[in-house]
Design a protein with these regions (language model features):
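Charge-rich, well-structured scaffold segments of protease-associated domains
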Residues: 1, 21, 80, 84-221
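His/Glu-rich zincin catalytic helix
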Residues: 1-85, 192-221
Length: 221
């Protein structure tokens, strides 16, 4: 199927990058730099911590999910029935990570070699959710410790105290990771519902910058 290419040139520095609309609906941004020794890739979805109330369609009833579920979902996507995505990245030499913000969740890696193999891993694990009662409950302790760590961070607490003072009802006032109490309510069914709502390719963007062949990247996608 045809892909829609567009070349975009930045007004400030004059560099150009390619924007491609993949037949799957995925938006792909490509910034080839031949002299770069490291290549960076990031796959993001427009889904963050503030999206805890949503409708899956105009006909569907509104849904409300526990605070921190977007961040919880980010953690759980790295785990599959066959193993851990970090282990797969280690075999290609790539350094991988992820983060959740108020409005987005992103999965990323950097590498100096085996780019296309690493890209396949990224696209594979993000599109292959695997949640069970056992694995979801196990993660509660891990994320609970992360929440307590941020509770001891003065800068983090000042920021959220400020947001709570400014916003009396908007979900931006709540911690991105949720609370120990809210994450205890998260179930595999809730994770699948959020995944199926927000992790569709039309709601996602893939961006690469570094030394690569744009056509080969699109072949992987």
């Amino acid at each position: 199927m045809d892909k829609q290419w567009q070349t975009i040139t930045g007004k400030q520095v004059g560099d150009s990058y390619f924007q491609v609309r993949h037949p799957s609906g995925l938006t792909i941004l490509l910034y080839p730099k031949e002299n770069s020794s490291t290549t960076y890739a990031i796959l993001g979805t427009r889904y963050g911590s503030i999206d805890n109330r949503f409708q899956r369609s105009d006909e569907a009833a509104p849904e409300e999910v526990p605070e921190g579920i977007a961040h919880y979902l980010e953690h759980k996507l790295f785990e599959s029935e066959d193993g851990d995505a970090f282990d797969r990245f280690s075999k290609t030499g790539a350094s991988a990570n992820a983060f959740t913000s108020f409005e987005t969740t992103c999965y990323l890696f950097s590498c100096t070699d085996a780019l296309y193999e690493s890209l396949e891993i990224l696209l594979d694990f993000v599109q292959a959710p695997y949640f069970t009662e056992e694995t979801v409950q196990k993660e509660q302790g891990i994320i609970g410790q992360e929440i307590k760590m941020y509770d001891d961070d003065p800068q983090w607490r000042v920021m959220f105290n400020y947001l709570k003072a400014m916003y009396h009802s908007h979900p931006i006032r709540e911690d991105i990771a949720g609370t120990v109490e809210s994450i205890a309510k998260i179930t595999p069914d809730l994770l699948y519902r959020c995944y199926n709502t927000f992790y569709n390719l039309g709601n996602m963007v893939l961006a690469l910058a570094g030394n690569f062949d744009a056509e080969k990247v699109l072949e992987v996608c």
